Design a protein with these regions (language model features):
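Short hydrophobic/aromatic-enriched beta-strand-loop microsegments
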Residues: 65-70, 198
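C-terminal segment of N-terminal export signals and the immediately downstream linker at the start
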Residues: 5, 27-49
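Short, structured coil segments at secondary-structure junctions
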Residues: 62-63, 97
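A general structural motif
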Residues: 64, 139-143, 176
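N-terminal secretory signal peptides and thylakoid transit peptides that target proteins
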Residues: 1-24
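Surface-exposed substrate-engagement region within the catalytic domains
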Residues: 55-61, 130-136, 151-198
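Substrate-binding cleft of extracellular glycoside hydrolase catalytic domains
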Residues: 42, 49-54, 69-153
């Protein structure tokens, strides 16, 4: 089954047309796309996916070093996320192809975002992350990344996200894991200032 099978031909063509039209509009206006710059040498790329599961040889042939995989269940209404959660078969396939796998936890999104529950949310979500990470062959001593898949305000960070991350970190450490933070630049910067995550 193709990873793109859920994408209809019509939707694909609409998206492609919009992308092309946007490129011409930016070029005509003299606008260039923003560039990201790494702080050090780029070592390679990893991919993040939830809609389906490509096999390890495909990931390797595309030149990636590995993948970032979800150690969380599909949320209600997201049945299309056939790649959640990661499985032991998938991690073994990637290892057999010389690839690395990083674990990331994200269940809710938007109105149901995990972090919106603050510290109480970590008590629910961290044990699930640990259980699914271990079931997929994830070793101790490695980070489990916690996703903050939003563009939060400083107030949301201070009142909900920081308590969520702090409690999540404490639970992970108590079980022999570390925590990473998978978020936008501002959120990562705030977390670094608070000594949260890697």
């Amino acid at each position: 089954m193709s990873i793109f099978s859920a994408l209809s031909r019509r939707r694909f063509l609409q998206t492609a047309a919009l992308t092309i039209a946007s490129s011409f509009a930016f070029a005509a206006a003299g606008i260039t796309a923003p560039q990201a710059f790494a702080l050090g040498p780029v070592l390679g790329t990893v991919i993040d996916y939830a809609a389906g599961v490509p096999d390890g040889s495909t990931i390797k042939e595309a030149g990636h070093l590995g993948s970032v995989r979800y150690v969380s269940q599909r949320r209600p209404g997201a049945e299309w996320m056939l790649g959640k959660p990661v499985t032991i078969e998938e991690t073994k396939d990637q290892a057999a192809n010389g690839l690395k796998v990083a674990s990331i936890y994200q269940f809710g999104k938007d109105e149901t975002a995990d972090w919106k529950q603050g510290a109480a949310g970590a008590a629910v979500h961290a044990p699930q992350a640990i259980q699914l990470h271990a079931a997929a062959g994830g070793p101790k001593g490695r980070p489990i990344y916690v996703a903050i898949d939003d563009n939060p305000s400083r107030e949301e960070y201070d009142n909900q996200i920081r308590p969520y991350l702090k409690a999540f970190d404490e639970i992970l450490k108590s079980q022999g894991y570390t925590m990473g933070v998978y978020a936008n630049y501002g959120t990562i910067d705030w977390a670094i200032q608070d000594g949260l995550g890697s």
